């Protein structure tokens, strides 16, 4: 299993890394929140750019990225436009989606970009190639806010992301019951033990699935999302509590 290194953080080694999302609407809110992150345990910051009011004007995006980079110091930055079809705030045309991600990668301010794997293989490949050419890593993602697919389906989606060249495959699914959480954990273990040659990120959402955000080191999920202020997905814990549990489990393993 290879790890993925972004700045001083090694994803896929030891304790699962903690990623904290920023979901501010205005530049002022986004930068103000970023400036508080030195007070909390955070390994990676995700800017959910789909929440930003100026997202469709790249000059405004670049302006925020520049100040975000300064506010975050050496903390790695993941930029994510989560589309409305996968639970995000806005819809976007494929060409604009590719351009936004590639331009962000080329800016020198971001360390990772997120690409939704079901955008279409050609667009996904274009973004991955563009990001890699700029020295930026790619998280390929898929989110199902309604159900938990079968174990084989989850594994196949993660394998598809790996085959397309993403550095870190990621899937988030919604449990209808406790058995669905076990399905996600079993799929994670199978992917890691049989197919993955790189770190993966998996989670079962909402309160029912919260255990999956805590036990990544046991089953093989390399990064987990915690909330500093507003959660960006159902089931996210506060970052301090999350860190406490991750460390307790790590010390017992």
Predicted regions and their residues:
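Short, Lys/Arg-enriched, disordered terminal segments
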Residues: 1-10, 251-253
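Short amphipathic alpha-helical surface micro-motifs
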Residues: 1-5, 60-61, 183-184, 206-207
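Solvent-exposed alpha-helices and their adjacent loops that cap or buttress functional pockets
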Residues: 9-14, 70, 105-107, 162-163, ...
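Catalytic alpha/beta core domains of metabolic enzymes, predominantly
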Residues: 112, 117-253
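Arginine residue identity/basic-tract feature
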Residues: 5-7, 48, 69, 82, ...
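Active-site beta->alpha loop and helix N-cap motifs at the rims of alpha/beta catalytic domains
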Residues: 2-4, 12-133, 143-147
